[in-house]
């Protein structure tokens, strides 16, 4: 089922302005292979719009696709495996190391949403309870004895039945949050699962980097939202969460690593991390991301 979105996925603003129309495209996350469920052959529109802060004082500025599709269709024949690339294996190990450094944890419960082939989770010491959540056929094939794989989307009733509230010390979701049709609900469910001093680390492609690099080939129908800091902060506020750090990374042409915790947890607050957040806010303000200017320039160059 193809759904035409009539409002912003974060703040509900109905004033959506077109950024660019890239025409109809086939699913990018699937390949035709013998003996494997063939992907849908029907293309879908790839139109990008933005929530306009100029038109409504509560607008968040999110950039998003105008359409979305059933995730069962997107992931029925998903091909990408994290462990194929040494670069990605090193990157995911670095994320785990950072999470352990921040929390100081020697044991506990860790969740990886969009766990794929379990590459990230394998980096945790054996003292941790490891849970992966992923709807893909790749996740369904994993057989690690010390990793519980829940082969479904997040959030879901199945996850709720299997994971207790306030039990997760570290949650990661790498390169998946931009695929989520209801990011506010997703964040609220993360909050429900996080322990009192738990942290959520996620990495997403950075919209400003895409604009700067003219990377229109990164605009695919799997990625239904394109994030910068302003709409992400709006999401966290709605969910009772907050940023305690943010860092730019070179992943896939430019991304941001986001560090989140409960809004009333000040365990990880320090001057350097606050400055990182401020620096990105200044950079986005100076890029006029809340105006038509960068989007008109982008469209004309494409």
Q: Model-predicted segments: where are they?
A:
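A conserved beta-strand element that flanks and buttresses the S-adenosyl-L-methionine
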Residues: 172
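A short glycine-rich, Lys/Arg-flanked "PGG" loop and its adjoining helix->strand segment in the class I
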Residues: 184-199
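Conserved SAM-binding strand-loop segment of SAM-dependent methyltransferases
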Residues: 145-161
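N-terminal juxtadomain amphipathic helix
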Residues: 1-86, 247
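Flexible, glycine-/basic-rich loop-and-beta segments that form/coincide
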Residues: 252-299
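A SAM-dependent methyltransferase catalytic signature shared across enzymes that methylate proteins
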Residues: 10-17, 229-246
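Extended interfacial segments that mediate partner engagement and assembly in macromolecular machines
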Residues: 40-47, 56-142, 220, 294-302
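Short, glycine-/aromatic-enriched active-site segment of Class I SAM-dependent methyltransferases
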Residues: 27, 202-225, 229-232, 236
